[in-house]
Regions:
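Hydrophobic pocket/interface hotspot
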Residues: 59-60, 69, 148-150, 180
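Hydrophobic ligand-binding cavity/cleft-lining segments
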Residues: 16-85, 175
Length: 192
């Protein structure tokens, strides 16, 4: 039993990427976004980072707002909560996306929350073959700003050339990080 559990933990994705000094130094110029093929060839690995001049609680409130999600993610057309933990530790969402010129697809995702620091998500149903990852929020500048780190694996439900899929994902993630920053700054500046 212990061996099986250890094997499961080893086989599970480890979301431990931390941006290095070169990435962090470049965040003043805009978000860092990296999209590359997964070594197993079945999916793509996405890594992104951004620094936002707003406290983690503000950024968190935007990341977890299903109604706002289509404004933050360019290819997301709708987001609907199907089930929610009464204690607020998780929810299950149905999302309809239409990236670029590709047909629309449906994904059902369970998100586990460690407010306001970590949001882990994984596919539970839908068209995507693979979808799992996390958002991490780290307070910086004495809590007045937030370092946002995003890491995920995703695989298209359609036969798409890898280079085209990576191009669309890179564009969408870059736009999503910019929208998250824009909305966070607007909320941070608004009178309470």
């Amino acid at each position: 039993m212990r061996f099986a559990l250890a094997l499961l933990l080893i086989a599970s994705p480890a979301w431990a990427w931390e941006p290095g000094p070169q990435v962090l130094g470049g965040l003043a110029r805009g978000p860092y976004v990296e999209v590359r093929p997964d070594p197993d060839g079945a999916s793509g690995l996405i890594r992104a980072a951004e620094e936002i001049a707003a406290p983690p609680e503000i950024v968190w409130s935007l990341l977890t707002d299903c109604a706002l999600a289509p404004r933050l993610a360019p290819s997301l057309k709708s987001c609907r909560i199907l089930e929610r933990d009464p204690a607020g530790r998780w929810d299950i969402r149905e999302q309809i996306s239409r990236p670029g010129l590709m047909p629309r697809f449906r994904s059902v995702v369970r998100s586990d929350f460690e407010a306001p620091r970590r949001l882990r998500f994984r596919r539970t149903d839908g068209d995507l073959k693979v979808l799992e990852g996390e958002w991490r929020l780290t307070p910086v500048r004495d809590g007045r700003a937030t370092r946002v780190v995003y890491e995920s694996r995703a695989a298209s439900p359609y036969a798409v050339p890898g280079s085209l899929a990576r191009l669309v994902i890179r564009r969408d993630v870059t736009l999503a990080m910019a929208a998250l920053k824009r909305e966070s700054l607007a909320r941070a500046m608004s009178p309470r």
